[in-house]
Amino acid sequence: MTDIKKEQEREELHRAIWAIADELRGAVDGWDFKNYVLGTMFYRFISEDLTNYINQNEIEAGDADFDYAKMSDEDAEEAREGLIEEKGFFMLPSELFCNVCANAANDENLNERLERIFNNIEGSAKGSESEADFSGLFDDFDVNSNKLGATVAKRNERLAKLLNGVKDMNLGDINDHSIDAFGDAYEYLMGMYASGAGKSGGEFFTLPEVSVLLTRLGTVGKKEINKAYDSACGSGSLLLKCAELLGRDAVRNGFYGQEINITTYNLCRINMFLHKIGFDKFDIACEDTLTNPQHWDEEPFELIVSNPPYSVKWVGDGDATLINDPRFAPAGVLAPKSKADMAFIMHSLSWLAANGTAAIVCFPGIMYRGGAEQKIRKYLVDNNYVDAVIQLSGGLFFGTSIATCIMVLKKGKSDNKVMFIDASKECIKVTNNNKLTPENIDRIVDVFAKREDVAHFSHLADYAEISENDFNLSVSTYVEPEDTREKIDIKKLNTEIAEIVAREQVLRSEIDKIIVEIEV
């Protein structure tokens, strides 16, 4: 099948999935209803994934007709302990998505049944290595919420439609490891929900094109890495782009991230499972990254990719202990209370491996503002940590038209220069937003890797030049934009004016002659 045909089929599948999801929500706001659709997709996925895992083992053992979904709960119990160790959780056959779905329309206690099943799934992981990955995973799937209906009967009716709607989504054969239909559909739906939600959506979802750019910047010349980390991981889209581009096994020791919003944290963990990242290959924490980081025992990280919130408030020097925090102390100053951007930069730098790269989306103001931010920039440049600054176009993110930039950090640079790239024109217009194309991304990464000057696009600046500019790291300071105004040839213009004046004199003389003749 050609790539074009595959893409067409993928787009058709996406449209069909969105139509189902949109119809299911009814009068409920799409942003509020997303947890139900995405949660149900996850329920279907782990049911099919577990069933397939068990069936494959039985087929290999010689029982070609075995089907775990048809097994009795009593017989299945014998496998509980082993499956929890291998898969991280356990489900009885009666709890599987297909079996619950088959009777959903006539189940007067469907809400209670689903609640019990979700509790059992989470409970099965308690006391095991996977407990943290499953704990609270279904908390945002409230089967008794009035959003589903005013009465129990109405709520159960909506839940039954939800189950059957997700059942009707063509998510392929889970045995086919060449596709990632569940993960792909999940990412697509999150993108649609984020687009509809505007600003709030942008806080949990980084567009795929930007994720590709960050990952490629962070992995130039590498085919595998030790660990990947995101300090503000949202729904995990950036971390999973690393898995997609490098391959899951090429990230040898797993994916790490921290997210402050508990709903988004749950979405992230679900996203990991749907993309077939094993429970033992990811560690996502829910806490404030700046004041309560959760991965001290796992750092340093070879790849850090992040799109942290822009200019959010934080405690800063309101907490006297933070200036002594090993992440922030080296700069001798904390990021301003009203703008935590540089705190995320310092946090990422601190946890970056000596052979690693961090690619971080930044609010442009941190590149030129004075005060504490200027002092932190000076610290970064003095110690040769800034590898590149890349200016992006505006309108690349949900909910904001801000033209953001990317700061690339390294601890093991081969030179003491900073690459500045003006990629503000590298995009195409799609409806009301801009979008990076594969060609745009290729050009940015190619120049970044070659570290060469390109007129009106890139400039490799040395320490002296940056110091002369008071450690201003704005791309516009170092890359002169192309003058697109029409070029005027003054000599040619003057000649044309002289010819016009001469012609005017000739015409006046002729007019005067005509007037004289008329008067006669």
Residue positions per predicted region:
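A generic secondary-structure signal for well-formed alpha-helical elements
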Residues: 44-57, 193, 222, 246, ...
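Residue-level detector of flexible, active-site-proximal loop/helix-junction positions
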Residues: 75, 235, 262, 291, ...
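Conserved S-adenosyl-L-methionine
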Residues: 200-306, 311-313, 317-322, 327-332, ...
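A conserved structural/catalytic subdomain of Rossmann-like adenosyl-cofactor enzymes
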Residues: 2-4, 8, 298-520
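A structure-centric signal for secondary-structure junctions around beta-strands
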Residues: 37, 182, 225, 252, ...
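Non-catalytic, mostly N-terminal accessory regions of nucleic-acid modification and defense proteins
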Residues: 1-213, 217-218, 283-289, 391-395, ...
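Residues within well-formed alpha-helices
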Residues: 20, 184, 241, 256, ...
